[in-house]
Design a protein with these regions (language model features):
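Nucleic-acid endonuclease domains
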Residues: 1-206
Length: 206
């Protein structure tokens, strides 16, 4: 059964009776921050509902009744590859992009914070967020002969992922055509968005 917390700013948080595991807290915090950023910077009158339930059958959040799945892909721009998970090999079930397709989630939103080291390596790259239509992204990946799915780690792998070259963001016309919106949002700007205390209470104590 889903319950709803209504915040003073109009944002709503859906949750289950059973608290979620603490390991999901960071991802949920980022989902809240990204949705809040979109609310402030794209449509202040929109209806933003964050889904913290166990089922999440309509993505991570809805924005004006459109559903969104959010994935943070840290280091993708500096490593050269965008990882798109499609199968949880531990549970033998669809996950990531494929689960979003099966759940008919409208949009797939990816955020790429850049790893930067002390001597300025990758200082020319910007933290980037890209918006895609879920179905279009999935079928594009499936139909590219040069892109194959592989285990995310050589040891203790728990997911099967497609690896899309990060250079496709600028160098591949068909991939560029999939991008509905592109924003350059510094990570510190997202981290500056406060997390409501009610959100922490939806997760188990450590």
């Amino acid at each position: 059964m889903k319950h709803c917390i209504k915040l003073e700013n109009g944002i709503e948080i859906l949750h289950s009776n059973k608290p979620k595991d603490r390991q999901y807290l960071w991802n949920t915090m980022m989902e809240f921050r990204v949705g809040s950023w979109m609310l402030e910077n794209t449509d202040p009158k929109a209806k933003f509902i964050l889904d913290c339930t166990w089922t999440q059958d309509q993505g991570d959040f809805t924005f004006n009744n459109a559903s969104f799945e959010f994935k943070e892909n840290r280091g993708a721009l500096s490593s050269g590859y965008i990882s798109l998970e499609v199968l949880n090999t531990t549970k033998c079930e669809p996950s990531g992009l494929l689960k979003s397709v099966n759940d008919q989630v409208n949009y797939f939103l990816m955020y790429f914070p850049v790893y930067r080291n002390y001597n300025g390596h990758n200082s020319d790259l910007m933290d980037t967020m890209l918006l895609f239509k879920t179905n279009e992204l999935y079928h594009w990946v499936r139909n590219r002969d040069e892109i194959t799915a592989s285990n995310n780690n050589t040891q203790n792998s728990n997911a099967l992922c497609y690896k899309v070259p990060a250079r496709y963001i600028t160098d591949c016309e068909s991939f560029k055509e999939l991008i509905i919106k592109q924003w350059h949002i510094p990570e510190y700007e997202l981290k500056a968005i406060d997390i409501p205390t009610q959100l922490y209470g939806l997760f188990k104590d450590e």
